[in-house]
Amino acid sequence: MSYNNKSIKELHELLVNKEISALELTKATLSDISAREPQIDAFLKITEEKALQDAAAIDARGINPDVVTDGISIAVKDNIVTEGIETTAASKILGGWIPPYNATVANKLSESGLITIGKLNMDEFAMGGSGENSSVKPTKNAWDQTKVPGGSSSGSAASVASGQVRLSLGSDTGGSIRQPAAFNGIVGLKPTYGRVSRFGLIAFASSLDQIGPLAPTVEENAQLLNVISGFDKNDSTSSNVAVPDFTSKIGQDIKGMKIALPKEYFGEGIDEKVKEQILAAAKHLEKLGAIVEEVSLPHSKYGVAVYYIIASSEASSNLQRFDGIRYGYRAQDIKNLEDLYVKSRSEGFGPEVQRRIMLGTFSLSAGSYDKHFKKAGQVRTLIINDFAKVFEKYDLILGPTTPTPAWDLGARVDDPLSMYLADLLTIPVNLAGLPGISIPAGFADGLPVGMQLIGKRYDEETIYKVAAAFEATTDFHKKQPIIFGK
């Protein structure tokens, strides 16, 4: 029997009432995975034996009635370090690496009774927006297996949308949770920078990376954020701002709330059908009592250029640690130390990772630092100031998550620029360190369209409040791809 259509609250009730054991639920989840995974390719590793052991241990101690996640399965993006379980960031250069420690979020999952059932596919080192940059295999979209699932958290979104797992963790550097969530018709949140510990997240761009939750509904997403948030002394960028109950405002009236609609988010390059769905969603929020007004974020048009200079520069520095010596892939038939470095990195990194390392190295070079990297930092400040100005008057910002619905697999592989522009609407949120969510808001040609809600720093509660109000009065989140019911 499959339980993939039940919320974690409903599953928890079954567990507490002993209508099902954690072991039985885990076996049912493994069965859901084996039925759907061959068509989706969301997983890099399924940790069946450990998951069953963990479930049996939970049954032996008894389900905690006060912890809604106790005994529930979750899958984790493969750039989140898991002790004793191979972690590769979908890269050949980390093939076979078994971490000797857990990421802070991995510890938090097990402390809250969540059972990690596997590691999820992704774009290599989280660099990509389609899921096609994995060195292992491309993940497929849950709604149409000829389409991309989005990236870089491709497996995180597709595994949830296809009914394999109820919850997953991803990471978001320029849209890598929100964009695949939009393409697969689920809920994905990038928390405020510093809200969730990055200790044990394989670094891409350290001033932008953030771990976040993916789930079928707003409430489940908030319940998972409750688990993973909080200060961590192991992460120097972790914030000790108090962690609220992120579900506390769900169900509240949104009457009188002020929502900003940036005109730049509806301009050139935005698909007409996507625009139509998002403007209809804005009208719907007005019917619920919100005040929606047009605003301007004038510097957002520079976001993509700024991001690719800053992110690539940080990646160029972060990825120097993969050298073929300490761990991971090591080239054979080498002549000397320099040859070892060159061959290991050339053979171990995929083309997109190499492209970004080169771009970052160039941006940091003596002749380019002031002209590119320093200037990008200055424009980043202007983008931050734009948001701050809007938030003086408004509670939230609303727009599309992506300019288009999911495109065909292979369509943009040889066109990195068009791939980069797909993150046009999500990137500014990372540059400003703000929280942002994508929720299902309609369909275009049978493919999901995501609406993005952007909030003030550390105000994920308000995002969830408005997202839940929209979800409760629409049916988009109830629609499921064919594969879900198989």
Swiss-Prot record:
Biased composition, class Polar residues, residue ranges: 132-144
Q: Which GO terms describe its molecular function?
A: ATP binding; glutaminyl-tRNA synthase (glutamine-hydrolyzing) activity
Q: Does the keyword Cell membrane apply?
A: no
- NCBIfam families, A to Z: gatA
The function of this protein is: Allows the formation of correctly charged Gln-tRNA(Gln) through the transamidation of misacylated Glu-tRNA(Gln) in organisms which lack glutaminyl-tRNA synthetase. The reaction takes place in the presence of glutamine and ATP through an activated gamma-phospho-Glu-tRNA(Gln).
Family designation: Belongs to the amidase family. GatA subfamily.
Can you name this protein? Glutamyl-tRNA(Gln) amidotransferase subunit A
